[in-house]
Amino acid sequence: MPYLLISTQIRMEVGPTMVGDEHSDPELMQQLGASKRRVLGNNFYEYYVNDPPRIVLDKLECRGFRVLSMTGVGQTLVWCLHKE
C-alpha cells in the first residue's frame, strides 16, 4: 500500500492523529503504535495514535514515506503520503 492519508482535527500541536482505516496495513499500524476504534455512529473502523501529526510524519519518513500534499478541510488537516 504505497499511499497513506493521515489527519487531525482542530489543533495540530496535539493528538490524536488518524493514521488509517480498517483496510490499512496492520504491520505499519503496529509499528506506529496505532489503536483501532469505531466511533459511535460510524459504521467503519479507524486507526489512531495519541501523537501529534509532526511525530507521526517523522516516524513515517523513517519508514520511507514522503509527503505529497497537505490541505485543510474545515477544522481538519489532511496529509497524503507515498512510499516508493
Swiss-Prot record:
Cellular component GO terms, alphabetical: cytoplasm; cytosol; dendrite; intracellular protein-containing complex; melanosome; nuclear membrane; nucleus; protein-containing complex
Oligomer status and interactors: Homopentamer. Forms a complex with GCH1 where a GCH1 homodecamer is sandwiched by two GFRP homopentamers. Interacts with GCH1.
Keywords assigned by UniProt, alphabetized: Cytoplasm, Membrane, Nucleus
Keyword check for Repeat: no
SUPFAM superfamilies for the chain: GTP cyclohydrolase I feedback regulatory protein, GFRP
Subcellular location: Nucleus; Nucleus membrane; Cytoplasm, Cytosol
GO molecular function terms attached to this record: amino acid binding; GTP cyclohydrolase binding; GTP cyclohydrolase I regulator activity; GTP-dependent protein binding; identical protein binding; protein-containing complex binding
Described purpose of this protein according to its UniProt entry: Mediates tetrahydrobiopterin inhibition of GTP cyclohydrolase 1. This inhibition is reversed by L-phenylalanine.
Top-level taxon in the UniProt lineage: Eukaryota
Recorded name of the encoding gene: Gchfr
UniProt source species: Rattus norvegicus (Rat)
Family as reported in the entry's similarity comment: Belongs to the GFRP family.
InterPro entries: GFRP_sf, GTP_CycHdrlase_I_reg
UniProt name for this protein: GTP cyclohydrolase 1 feedback regulatory protein
Bilayer-crossing regions: none
BP term (GO), one: protein-containing complex assembly
Tissue: Liver and kidney. Somewhat lower level in testis, heart, brain and lung.
